[in-house]
Amino acid sequence: MKFYLVGGAVRDNLLKLPIKDRDYMVVGAAPEQMFELGYKQVGKDFPVFLHPKTQQEYALARTERKTGSGYGGFSCDASPDVTLEEDLLRRDLTINAIAQDDKGELFDPYGGIKDIESKMLRHVSDAFVEDPLRVLRVARFAARFHHLGFTVADETLALMTKISQSGELEALTSERVFLELDKALSTQNPQIFIEVLNQCQALEILFPEIHALFGVPQPEKWHPEIDTGIHTLMVLAQAAKLSDENSVRFAALVHDLGKALSPKATLPKHHGHGQSGLALIKVLCARAKVPNEYRDLALLVSDQHQNVHNIRELRPETLIKIFDKADLWRKPDRLEQLATACEADSKGRLGLENSPYPQADYLRESFQVANSVAVKPIIEAGFKGAEIKEQLKLKRIEIVTEFKRNFNESAIE
């Protein structure tokens, strides 16, 4: 019986990255031997055990054989005669197929260390195509390690494309697809996840609403990058720089879905695209089982980003309507999320990545002013029921009008 540290812990140690989880592989052992040592079994589909003291996972070395469709269509053999090399052969990427024994010696039968040195994401074997989930995993690794210079090997991208064309991606559950998207959104470069999925033809299958944006032109005057798909990638990249919140990053990703619906006769203009995109966002979120928190912010950003861009020109009444629609009185955190997503949209344009976005501060300040109106004096003045709400609205419009006047006067000075 031999124990090996495997997978992400070995990879991240070689990359000099923080190690989050440690997974171990056990060669030459049967479940009965693990029980005798005090380990508790937790895996149903294949033997995974928890260490009696550390609670870390120890999996018996195993091989896998494709028996059906999807990422669950496998049977496995975890007998004691499965070798280290056989177990590592079933793994997705060479950088994840390195093992380390208890003396620190590395075992790298498939060239993972060389690929780490050359910054390459490469499949271990042609069995890669048997698991459609690997398309999403590799795209996520590409996003996660992009800042280190990693790219996907051409031959691996070819196998990912083969999976996309096979129809196997349809076997993935909505929950699993969103889980991979959510993990990718939390990386430094989530736009790479979308880019890689597009390169291997998976984007049009998993997220057709996003794929439809590529090739849709925008006015060059406002969008030097022209292509709406490219703009979307740039906005997502900016959102990742401006916010750690995945909900903000998701809103940035889907804020322009309506541009794919613009009539060809009106291109490259996209009148009302924020509103026309709302139905597409709802469809995408329902299909992918996106959390309500993400969906609601995405709908708000799509609906209002044009207004925020032009906020200086809006009437005070319109500003209050935006605050009402966003429910900022009860959910003030949304203000920062909305401002950040709109700033990402503005900066997600070729050559304008470092341009200022004063609209965000104007939005913050105008809401702060409107939110300073107290309801107590209104009640004390004798107003009741619906009258209170109406008076509150009028007072807010009045004070925002004064703020707008003072702001404009100071701008002239």
Curated annotation (Swiss-Prot):
User: Which UniProt keywords are given for this protein, alphabetically ordered?
Assistant: ATP-binding, Hydrolase, Magnesium, Metal-binding, Multifunctional enzyme, Nickel, Nucleotide-binding, Nucleotidyltransferase, RNA repair, RNA-binding, Transferase, tRNA processing
Q: How is the cofactor bound?
A: Magnesium is required for nucleotidyltransferase activity. Nickel for phosphatase activity.
Protein encoded by which gene:
cca
Could you give the subunit structure recorded for this chain? Monomer. Can also form homodimers and oligomers.
Q: What job does the chain carry out?
A: Catalyzes the addition and repair of the essential 3'-terminal CCA sequence in tRNAs without using a nucleic acid template. Adds these three nucleotides in the order of C, C, and A to the tRNA nucleotide-73, using CTP and ATP as substrates and producing inorganic pyrophosphate. tRNA 3'-terminal CCA addition is required both for tRNA processing and repair. Also involved in tRNA surveillance by mediating tandem CCA addition to generate a CCACCA at the 3' terminus of unstable tRNAs. While stable tRNAs receive only 3'-terminal CCA, unstable tRNAs are marked with CCACCA and rapidly degraded.
Q: Which cofactor is essential here?
A: Mg(2+); Ni(2+)
Per UniProt, where does ATP bind? Answer: 8, 11, 91, 137, 140
What is this protein's record name? Multifunctional CCA protein
Q: Which residues bind CTP?
A: 8, 11, 91, 137, 140
Further remark: A single active site specifically recognizes both ATP and CTP and is responsible for their addition.
* InterPro entries xref list: CCA_bact, HD/PDEase_dom, HD_domain, NT_sf, PolA_pol_head_dom, PolyA_RNA-bd, tRNA_CCA-adding_enzyme
The HD domain sits at 228-329
Name the residues that bind Mg(2+): 21, 23
E.C. numbers: 2.7.7.72, 3.1.3.-, 3.1.4.-
> What are its GO biological-process terms?
RNA repair; tRNA 3'-terminal CCA addition
- Superkingdom, natural source: Bacteria
Q: Which family does it belong to?
A: Belongs to the tRNA nucleotidyltransferase/poly(A) polymerase family. Bacterial CCA-adding enzyme type 1 subfamily.
Q: What is known of its domains?
A: Comprises two domains: an N-terminal domain containing the nucleotidyltransferase activity and a C-terminal HD domain associated with both phosphodiesterase and phosphatase activities.
Q: Which GO terms describe its molecular function?
A: ATP binding; CCA tRNA nucleotidyltransferase activity; cyclic-nucleotide phosphodiesterase activity; magnesium ion binding; phosphatase activity; tRNA binding
- Which reaction is catalysed here? a tRNA precursor + 2 CTP + ATP = a tRNA with a 3' CCA end + 3 diphosphate; a tRNA with a 3' CCA end + 2 CTP + ATP = a tRNA with a 3' CCACCA end + 3 diphosphate
